[in-house]
Amino acid sequence: MDKKIRIGMVQFEGNLGDVHSNIVHARELIGSAAAQGADIVCLPELFATGYNLSLLAEKTVSLGCAHYEYIVAEMAAAAKDNRVYLIAPAGRKTEMEGILTNSALLFDQNGALTGYFDKSHLWALERLYYKEGNAYPVFDIRLQDRSTRIGIMICYDAGFPESCRSLALQGAEIVFCPAAWRIQDVDMWDLNLSQRALENLLFVVGVNRFGHEGDLELFGKSKICNPRGRVLRELPMDRESVDVFEIDLMDVERFRTEIPYLRDRKPHIYGELLK
């Protein structure tokens, strides 16, 4: 059975607060990934508005609310035009007026918004402008002759083992981690992604922003880790980049047979984890 899927990573360099130019640029890069044969394309955290919340301040909410429908429409068109699944992280308008979540939107190959994940562990200033999420949904990806189940965690979520484990227990084979990860914590980026992949025996795809937003340096180094935690592909730290890499999902079954972490769990003695 063919279980190979081509993953597109868009290591994006944007302009803080300039939603229109960021959308135009993102569509170009999505097209580049599709031209390289990507089945699923992932953008980094808050690609459309930018991330430096100390500079955006109250504009974080006004930009997100004012441009949400525009972002959704453009990303839906990008997915449909390029016939790819697309993970587009953005502030998501909730049913409450003026309230956003820091989210990742999932579009299918027809441009339909099929689901979203709301970041649950908010970092620093994020909690002033975003509402936290409270669920870890999984999503079924259906290609012509292949299918898989994916999950999403966003940036700081990756530091909490429970995030990725929740997705693995629901059958995820790939977990995407769009991020705006700062240069001071590059070591944690490397450790967290590989460890989440290994302990759950699945693929982790980390897609980080690149560039400077004021005093915030975002270093890229987007990567794909296999179910043993090994880095299969890593993008540079010194520039924007688009890359497509093929993974074989049969590796998930193979490694879960060889190293049965999930099978050998003992939930009945983990009660302290729920406190």
Question: Language-model features: where?
Answer:
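Short beta->alpha transition motifs characteristic of CBS
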Residues: 49, 56, 105, 117-123, ...
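A short C-terminal boundary segment appended to hydrolase-like catalytic domains
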Residues: 253-275
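Short beta-strand scaffold segments in enzyme catalytic cores
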Residues: 89-90, 103-106, 137, 222-224, ...
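Cys-nucleophile CN-hydrolase/nitrilase-fold catalytic domain and related Cys-dependent amidase chemistry
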Residues: 19, 28-110, 182-202
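CN hydrolase (nitrilase-like) catalytic-core segments centered on the catalytic cysteine
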Residues: 68-87, 159-242
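Extreme N-terminal starter segment of soluble prokaryotic enzymes
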Residues: 2-9
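Short polar catalytic/cofactor-binding loops
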Residues: 11-16
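Active-site catalytic loop in hydrolytic enzyme cores
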Residues: 67, 95-173, 182-191, 195, ...
